Amino acid sequence: MNAGCASMDMDKDGKSLFVLGGNAMQKMDLSGETLKPINYKAEMKMDLAAEREYMFDHVYKQQQKRFYNTNMHGVNWDTMSAAYRKFLPHINNNYDFAELLSEWLGELNVSHTGGRFSPSIPGDATASLGVLTDWNYKGKGASIMEGIEKGPFDHARSKVKAGTIIEKINGQEIPPETDYHTLLNDKANKKTLVSLYNPQSGERWEEVVIPIGNGILNNLLYKRWVKQGAADVDKWSDGRLGYVHIQSMGDDSFRSVYSDILGKYNNREGIVIDTRFNGGGRLHEDIEVLFSGKKYFTQVVRGREACDMPSRRWNKPSIMLTCEANYSNAHGTPWVYSHQKLGKLVGM
């Protein structure tokens, strides 16, 4: 069905299965296990003003019954809700309605509340060649400053290096001081011909690459940023300290941090824990346990120190970085780290 998710329901006789996924409804005969499309036509009339009024009432009741502080942070919820309700008749779209919800809920002065409108508007997607270019370059084409690791040009056959000029994309020349990204519109995952020039040797050549989408690009740039942070800490500490970044307060990030501090950084004297720009999750207890180890035993095998105990927690000094862009549990985790006196907290 090529759908991101699907729902299923069985008929009362248990002979057929109805599957709804994407924009299609299908029926499966369980005896033959074959899917057959179900064609239908339906119309629905929506009273959007009434729908928004219902949602307003729902928000009012949810906050009244479930807000964590029974005093509602000192806000008279009935009076405040009545003041905002009067704007409802004058709202005719969900964008403005989301703004109304955000302003209204903002009166409670608490995080994790608000309204958001996300319209589904199919748009063009600009691909990337996975390179960083020199914005000060004034000639034809684009001058490459750096090819991003694991990007489209990062392979053994490519001759691209710093200083290489991108002259053409799919045969189209790039005029001076022109944003070449317009030539990459809708080119993600599609073979693309790139004409290149080495101004030092005078060589011109072509390479076929497969541009990447923004999601992959952002992930590669993130890894580049973390790698640079680790290199800086390694340089500034003369190899005495390690560096890890907690991308999100979830299982994947925890496993990555755990692997690094007890793996390649196991013999370092200390660790820098970077939580900046983390969007949250729930990891504060795991981080507290991981970085609160206190050495109580050293295992010696044949006269050589083999490991310290506990061997599955960090027993050495650490320091944690935070910033104003941290959200949710990425704010709570640094608080726990500081409150438990696990180490110094640096940042706002």
Tell me what each language-model feature is.
Residues 2-18, 153:
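Conserved beta-propeller blade repeats
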Residues 18-23, 197-198:
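Beta-strand C-termini and the immediately following turn/loop, strongest in propeller blades
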Residues 22-31:
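Structural motif
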Residues 30-108, 112-114, 138, 142:
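Terminal targeting/pro-maturation regions of precursor/exported proteins
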Residues 64-66, 167, 172-348:
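Cleft-lining beta-strand/loop regions that shape enzyme active-site pockets
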Residues 70-78, 98-101, 113-123, 159, ...:
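Short coil/turn segments at secondary-structure boundaries
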Residues 88-140, 202-228:
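Extended, small/polar residue-biased N-terminal targeting/export presequences
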Residues 124-177, 251, 327:
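PDZ/PDZ-like domain segments forming the peptide/carboxylate-binding groove
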